[in-house]
Amino acid sequence: MTRFFQHSLLALAVSALACGAAVAGPAAALPKDLPAYAADKPLPVPDIGRKTLANGLEVWVVPRDGIPRVDYVLAVRNAGYAADAADAPGFAALLAGLLAEGTAQRDSRQIAEFAQAQGGGVGASVNSDGALVYGNALAANAGPMLSLLAEVARTPAFPESEVRLAQANALQALKAAEAQPGFRANRALLSAVYGEHPYARTQQTEASITAVTPAVLRSEHQRRFHPDRSLLVVAGRIDADTAFALAEQAFGDWAASGAEVAPTAAAPRDARPQRLLLQRDGSVQSTLRLASPAVAATDPDAIPLQLAGTVLGGSFSSRVMQNLREEKGYTYGARAGASTSAQGGHVSGAADVRNEVTGAALTEFFKEYARIGSEPVPATELDDTKRYVAGGYLIGNQMQAAVAATLAGNWLVGLPPEYLGEFVPRVRAVDAAQVQAMAAKYFAPERQSIIVVGDGGSVADQLADWGEFTTLK
């Protein structure tokens, strides 16, 4: 699931430079003879070679001249958090993390040493919609590295010692996370938006971690990793025919075993707004979250909604940041935006504020939510936002590894390969009326659930204007 909170340091630096005047005080007048901004350069859609193996595995090849390197991403649908059982939230994270920690042929050290000998590495990650197994190597070692990636993806052994170590590490990480109010707030946010839908189950629990065994991992791997629900993206200094031949050698005899996971159902879009106060004794600040259901990544509303969210809270110069931080001094940072997945999505807002201004901060959040939905975004502000979103996308997809990851990630959520080059023109085509309509539809104050993590004795009275809150320990 795309998290709008996860900004790269580069994007933050660009944002900070773009809005330095907001930090330093009134901006100096710019010279009148400065040239106009150049038009955004579209990201050219690469010439993608495509082939489907007999077992159903799709293979996309993106030949690129440049550094002598190849990058691989194997994307597997229905292998992510949404495939986890209701009593095993976050299981997919352990499964993905253990893929490269031992196979039927090698232990974890041998895997790491072999990958390093090829001039690269191998690993895996997971999101709500699927799993990603990735690797890279010098172009001269493209074959051996793809064989290793296939070994990791197809024949993980889940050794007892590695499973126990992963569990111990996960329990320590969970203990640290649960001490943070943001972790509790985000867990409550997902539950409020998605209810019993699998998209609510991305955070591990002590019970879900301790219940994992090598046998369970092997069984779930067989259910989740099927060739006919997978895509292999190959990018780098390699021609399509060579890549197809290597893919056939590494994956051609891959056969599904075990009953496959059922596809994820559509997420609800009509969740009743909730009011939750998560008690945190002695807290001197309140952690605020606002959220409501939104759209899937393939919905026509997705890009205009992303722009609305960016205007509202997606950069340092965004409206909620300028209001709550720069004007009011309530917080170090306030943000808002949209997250999309294959079967649904949500909008959310977030800030940590002093106890004394908890209610006032909510007032300012909703003032900005109402304003963006009731009046057009000025042309200059909208154009700046478009350039920020499009520019970040172009910068983020300069490297071939990023292109491979973007293609694989888009495929997981149902977007075609052409979307890689269509994104920037679609962003540029959005007008102020569309942004206003998206804001009015999805950021409407009356649609939002409110989650507050803080000391009820200090802030409960300030929440009365927002309805009756259920207090949870």
Regions found by a protein language model. Name each.
Residues 28-30, 34-36, 200, 231-296, ...:
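An aromatic/glycine/proline-enriched structural segment found at the starts
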Residues 187, 197, 214-250, 446-449:
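Non-catalytic, conformational "gating/processing" segments within enzyme and secreted inhibitor domains
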Residues 169-188, 266-285, 325-331, 342, ...:
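Short acidic/His-enriched helical or mixed secondary-structure segments at domain edges of catalytic enzymes
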Residues 101-105, 136-167, 315, 335-396, ...:
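M16/insulysin-pitrilysin zinc metalloprotease superfamily fold
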Residues 25-41, 231-233, 351, 386-473:
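C-terminal regions of mature proteins
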Residues 32-49, 173, 191-230, 262-267, ...:
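Histidine-acidic residue clusters that define the catalytic metal-binding segment
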Residues 27-31, 104, 111-220, 383-401, ...:
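Acidic/histidine-enriched segments that form metal/cofactor-coordinating
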Residues 72-136, 201-203, 315-330, 343:
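M16/MPP (pitrilysin/insulinase) zinc-metallopeptidase core fold and M16-derived inactive scaffolds
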